[in-house]
């Protein structure tokens, strides 16, 4: 199976301290939140009951946090894990501010660590991702570790080899 040219990065293309701005963003719709609530069976009224939510400190329904995370990480795939062999770890998910329908999310990742594995043809990249809304407010941060190939990896190297 071939991958789109420019989709994902090899281990050699990551450097500690590198900041990757993921584009484009993604605007959250009411349908997104409703379907995600149905898929995950999350029935909390803060997410589904407009009358209840209007009486809270937020004054309106709040988008589910796991949906914010899913969109936030999805925005990073083309730049961070598009060539991944595996996602190894996700940690330290922090909600900093609520997200509402109509908000547009943008992700930005900082490379925290890059090291080659013992196999020599792959390595682990650690990143911290900040998810911001259209006002530039950080709504969520999380860290993850991704196993990515080097350019010399026998089956994933150039991204165009058939399996």
Positions of PLM-derived features:
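HotDog/MaoC-like acyl-thioester-processing domains
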Residues: 1-18, 95, 99-104, 108-163
């Amino acid at each position: 199976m071939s991958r789109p040219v420019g989709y994902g990065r090899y281990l050699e293309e990551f450097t500690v301290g590198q900041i990757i701005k993921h584009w484009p963003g993604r605007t959250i719709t009411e349908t997104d939140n409703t379907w995600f609530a149905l898929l995950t069976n999350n029935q909390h009224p803060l997410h589904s009951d407009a009358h209840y939510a209007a009486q809270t400190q937020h004054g309106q329904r709040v988008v589910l946090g796991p949906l914010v995370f899913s969109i936030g990480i999805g925005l990073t795939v083309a730049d961070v894990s598009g060539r991944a062999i595996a996602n190894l770890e996700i940690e330290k998910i922090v909600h900093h501010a609520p997200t509402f329908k109509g908000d547009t999310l943008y992700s930005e990742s900082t490379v925290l660590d890059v090291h080659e594995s013992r196999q020599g043809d792959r390595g682990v990249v650690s990143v911290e991702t900040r998810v911001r809304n259209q006002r530039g407010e950080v709504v969520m941060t999380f860290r993850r570790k991704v196993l990515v190939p080097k350019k010399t990896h026998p089956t994933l190297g150039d991204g165009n080899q058939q399996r």
